[in-house]
Amino acid sequence: MDPPNLTFELDDANQDWAWPENTFDFIYVRFLSGCIRDWDKFYREAFRCLKPDGWFEHHEVGIGWTCEKGGITPDSPIGQFVQAFSIAGEKIGQTFRVVEDGLQTKGMKAAGFVDLEEKILRCPLGSWPTDPQLKQVGLMMNEVLLGDLEGM
């Protein structure tokens, strides 16, 4: 059951937002890489619709995969995957390189957001980590990737 003061809103984030200024206390978005045409406009609209002292939270996953022991080369399967997404994003004008190009921080600052906090988290893929929590994350990410590959 949702709290009485909670509503979920859905709209096309590429358009002018339908809500008036100072509407929301909290805006949460995630995984919009490859979806937004104009990141600066997106952040301006979020800032405009957020109440003074409101909170905006945006989570994104980078596509610039790395390996602690090396081994991800441009011709490897993962390297080709990253290259294909980078090229596709350029062709449609909707980048997948939001994290790698620093678009979140740049866009939020330009829109007027203050007190920005950026967290870059390590996200393993597979069961290789020895840390139990990272191992669990790695197994979940493996399932997410395998489940989503068909749709990509």
Task: Identify the residue ranges that each predicted region occupies.
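Short N-terminal helix/helix-N-cap motif within the alpha/beta-hydrolase-1
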Residues: 36-38
